From Swiss-Prot:
May activate the peptidyl carrier protein (PCP) domains of fengycin synthase by transferring the 4'-phosphopantetheinyl moiety of coenzyme A (CoA) to a serine residue. It catalyses: apo-[peptidyl-carrier protein] + CoA = holo-[peptidyl-carrier protein] + adenosine 3',5'-bisphosphate + H(+). It is an enzyme of class 2 (transferase). GO terms for biological process: antibiotic biosynthetic process; fatty acid biosynthetic process; lysine biosynthetic process via aminoadipic acid. GO terms for molecular function: holo-[acyl-carrier-protein] synthase activity; magnesium ion binding. This is 4'-phosphopantetheinyl transferase ffp. It comes from Bacillus subtilis.
Length: 224
């Protein structure tokens, strides 16, 4: 299992953008051009090329030759490499990629003030109760802690919106353990959180608990 992070400390230059665009599909190039905000295009582009870079090094392929598809519920995959599982998440200044030989999910969220009504709407009753039990000053932080863990689980499952957020509970125990409560869910899954930035929450969900201790940082230059 490998987890990589790109910190976008500056916008991509036009030269860097053109170089990265040369690796991706025509459909992805068009998608990037349609974004209103350049930052959204840059995050999407960096995520795509991050996957290509990691997979190309692992399997000795050219980055531009890798072809992506989507599973039944829309999770990206590489049909020619069924054991090359990956997942991408981006928010704010961060692009994160997680890679493993089994299904994996990752989520990073830039924190901002939230309404408890959002938690009541999307969280399970147990999660909402856990949130309300926190001191008011801790609730925003705990909300994003839960949200990132729940999203990482949904992305690891690969079922998208067919698995509602309130259909399962993620519980963070006092000893640091994380458990997922979902009726009739028998597939092993493990969740680890990472503190990559004070203003963000990040979580990875995998089929095995052998998570790396830290993420590996990747520069723009390493992708070119």
């Amino acid at each position: 299992m490998k987890i990589y992070g790109i910190y976008m400390d500056r916008p991509l230059s036009q030269e860097e953008t053109d170089r990265l665009m040369s690796f991706v599909s025509a459909e992805k190039r068009e998608k990037c051009r349609r974004f209103y905000h350049k930052e959204d295009a840059h995050r999407t582009l960096l995520g795509d090329v991050l996957v290509r870079s990691v997979i190309s090094e692992q399997y000795q392929l050219n980055k531009a030759d890798i072809r992506f598809s989507a599973q039944e519920y829309g999770k990206p995959c590489i049909p020619d490499l069924p054991n090359a599982h990956f997942n991408i998440s981006h928010s704010g200044h961060w692009v994160i990629g997680a890679f493993d030989s089994d299904p994996i999910g990752v989520d990073i969220e830039k924190m901002k003030p939230i309404s408890l009504g959002i938690a009541e709407r999307f969280f399970s009753k147990n999660e909402y109760s856990d949130l309300l039990s926190k001191h008011k000053d801790e609730q925003n932080d705990y909300f994003y802690h839960l949200w990132s863990m729940k999203e990482s689980f949904i992305k690891q499952e690969g079922k998208g919106l067919s698995l509602p957020l309130d259909s399962f509970s993620v519980r963070l125990h006092e000893d640091g353990r994380v458990s997922v409560e979902l009726p009739e869910h028998h597939t092993p899954c493990f969740i680890k959180t990472y503190e990559v930035d004070p203003g963000y929450k990040m979580a990875v969900c995998a089929a095995r608990p052998d998570f790396p201790e830290d993420i590996t940082m990747i520069s723009y230059e390493a992708l070119l």
